[in-house]
A protein has these predicted regions:
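Surface-exposed loop/edge segments in extracytoplasmic proteins
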Residues: 62-72, 190-196, 243-248
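Bacterial signal peptide processing site
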Residues: 19-22
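Positively charged n-region of N-terminal signal peptides that target proteins for export
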Residues: 1-5
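Edge beta-strands of extracellular beta-sandwich domains
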Residues: 106-113, 244-252
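Conserved structural position at the C-terminal beta-strand
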Residues: 99, 238-240
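C-terminal motif of bacterial Sec signal peptides marking the signal peptidase cleavage site
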Residues: 14-17
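Hydrophilic extracytoplasmic domains
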Residues: 244, 251-295
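Short, low-hydrophobicity acidic/polar segments
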Residues: 24-178, 183, 207-226, 230-232, ...
């Protein structure tokens, strides 16, 4: 798995009147045509939006009519997938959106086990809210407007992430044999995502478990996506040349926070693992530092 760093996804949504003018002169409903300016927006484990990606958009004040409306990315633009959203009155409308789209919406259950990690875009929940528009100003922009004194309406990662980079320490040579896999224990692997408010919640009533990830094709960097959860530390086991090397990852602030990527450097030494302290940033990279792995 390649090293990937994440930026907050941004999405510009333009509401265009049928006559292509910003001002609605005849009072007719304004058909909503959603287009996306995705450069340099990224999503889902550090990749750009991909053709076929689907988001769910809701007109917050008119959610009974325009709730969880699917839009799909085609030719670089998000288009209505069937139903079209209209602004039908003179009020200001506020919108929210989430990724990835689910036809049911509401509170979705998910797992972050090893199988789910193979399709990270499906568990990389994103959420944006607060962007507004009306008939005469039909441009709804899911972007960060704070630089101009406005609000941040951009898409945000709602899950947490841990990224491990493995390095050869004293007495170890990765040129021929590299670590095969690693296991993190003490994780809550199941939880929910609320498409209405963007909150991802770990299932605190569940039993914690292990997550084992193979380091395929000699990759020395691996990222996993997890539900935000309270956890002070996580036992780490690295399998290398038939031996188990043990260490502990310490969580800054005693928790995995939504939108943060906790990065650690794990040095495999002759008989120990050396693990750095975490660094934290907005998917959000949080440097965990170095970790020493020992037998």
């Amino acid at each position: 798995m390649k090293t990937r760093f994440f930026t907050l996804a941004t999405l510009a949504l333009a509401l265009a009147a049928c006559n292509n003018d910003n001002e609605n002169l005849n009072g007719d409903p304004v058909a909503a045509q959603f287009t996306a300016d995705i450069a340099p927006a990224t999503r889902a484990s550090g990749t750009t939006w991909t053709a076929g990606d689907r988001i769910g958009i809701t007109d917050i004040g008119n959610d009974s009519q325009y709730g969880n409306v699917p839009f799909i990315l085609k030719n670089g633009k998000f288009e209505a997938e069937g139903k079209v959203i209209y602004i039908e009155d003179t009020k200001t409308h506020t919108f929210r959106a989430y990724y990835p789209y689910n036809a049911v919406g509401g509170i979705l259950t998910a797992t972050t086990d090893a199988t789910a990690q193979q399709n990270q875009p499906a568990i990389d929940f994103l959420f944006a809210s607060g962007a507004t528009g009306d008939k005469n100003n039909p441009v709804v922009s899911f972007t960060d407007k704070t630089a101009k004194g406005g609000e941040d309406n951009s898409f945000h990662h709602r899950m947490s992430q841990i990224t491990l980079t493995f390095e050869a320490g004293d007495g170890v040579n990765f040129s021929v044999v590299k670590p095969e896999r690693y296991t993190l224990d003490g994780l809550l692997l199941t939880g929910t995502f609320n498409t209405a408010d963007g909150i991802a919640t770990a299932d605190n009533g569940a039993q914690t478990g292990e997550l084992t990830m193979n380091l395929a094709d000699g990759n020395l960097t691996s990222s996993i996506i997890l539900f935000p959860q309270t956890v002070a530390s996580l036992p780490l086991v690295v399998n290398y040349k038939g031996q188990e090397y043990h260490a502990t990852l310490t969580m800054p602030e005693g928790a995995l926070q939504a939108g943060n990527n906790y990065t650690y450097t794990v040095k495999v030494r002759n008989k120990v693992l050396e693990v750095s302290e975490a660094t934290i940033a907005k998917w959000n990279d949080i440097d965990g530092g170095e970790v020493n792995a020992g037998l």
